[in-house]
């Protein structure tokens, strides 16, 4: 089996770069780890947000393409990005998101996790997972959110597929994830990574999604070294 160590980063598509920056740094309290350009489109920024050290598994990046139409997340796409926050931060985040008129969902449970959902300014579906493993991880103490409540990293991502099987096989056979259970039409896969350890696939029989603002561009996975990366690439 070709092992990876979970999610390395997730890249999504945004609209206005200033609006994106203000939301992820001032509302969610993430650190702007790096600002560079899209190497395939040098006229476009590439914005990286993460924890204090910019560790793999904490980084969400964006290509802000203002001219692009709004996307329609659906089958064949990643349809949600989840962050880990401490369990004691639940009321803080509910109050914060409501105060900022972000209309968070009521707290709901999935695979035993307590979660709230909301959207960023471009409509990207986000979740905060009140994760016991985050309770023992320090938060960034220089951000807009107090350290005790700060986002710790990426928890995982949700994919929508017509048939979860082929993607599930890839996760298990080539990327080192283990099948962790089923809840209705949702299937969970888990790695042993500290951050970015969860991929969930929902069986979705609706229309194919359309890329655009507010959708995920790609998910990158970690490999232990160059040799392991080459092995995975050959499979």
Per-region residue spans from a language model:
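Peripheral, non-catalytic segments flanking oxidoreductase cores
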Residues: 59, 64-72, 131-132, 141
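Conserved acetyl-CoA-binding loop of GNAT-fold acetyltransferases
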Residues: 26-32, 102, 172-180
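Short secondary-structure capping/turn segments at boundaries of alpha-helices and beta-strands
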Residues: 31-36, 48-49, 67-69
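Short, solvent-exposed loop/turn segments that connect beta-strands within catalytic domains
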Residues: 41-42, 52-58, 194-195
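Surface-exposed interaction/gating patches
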Residues: 148-234
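Short, solvent-exposed loop/turn segments at the edges of secondary structure
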Residues: 42, 57, 76-78, 152, ...
């Amino acid at each position: 089996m070709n092992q990876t160590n979970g999610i390395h980063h997730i890249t999504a598509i945004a609209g206005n770069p200033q609006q994106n920056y203000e939301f992820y740094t001032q509302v969610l309290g993430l650190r702007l780890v790096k600002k560079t350009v899209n190497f395939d489109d040098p006229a476009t920024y590439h914005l990286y947000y993460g924890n204090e050290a910019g560790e793999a598994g904490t980084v969400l990046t964006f290509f802000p393409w203002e001219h692009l139409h709004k996307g329609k997340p659906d089958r064949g796409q990643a349809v949600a990005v989840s962050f880990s926050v401490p369990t004691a931060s639940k009321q803080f985040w509910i109050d914060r998101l409501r105060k900022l008129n972000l209309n968070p969902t009521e707290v709901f449970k999935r695979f035993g996790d307590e979660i709230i959902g909301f959207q960023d300014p471009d409509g990207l579906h986000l979740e905060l997972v009140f994760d016991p493993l985050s309770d023992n991880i320090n938060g960034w103490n220089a951000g807009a959110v107090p350290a005790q409540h700060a986002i710790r990293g990426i928890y995982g991502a949700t994919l929508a597929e017509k048939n979860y099987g082929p993607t599930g096989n890839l996760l298990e056979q080539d990327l080192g994830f283990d099948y962790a259970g089923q809840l209705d039409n949702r299937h969970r896969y888990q790695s042993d990574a500290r951050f970015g350890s969860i991929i969930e696939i929902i069986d979705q029989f609706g229309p194919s999604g359309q890329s655009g603002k507010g959708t995920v561009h790609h998910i990158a996975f970690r490999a232990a070294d160059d040799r392991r990366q080459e092995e995975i690439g050959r499979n």
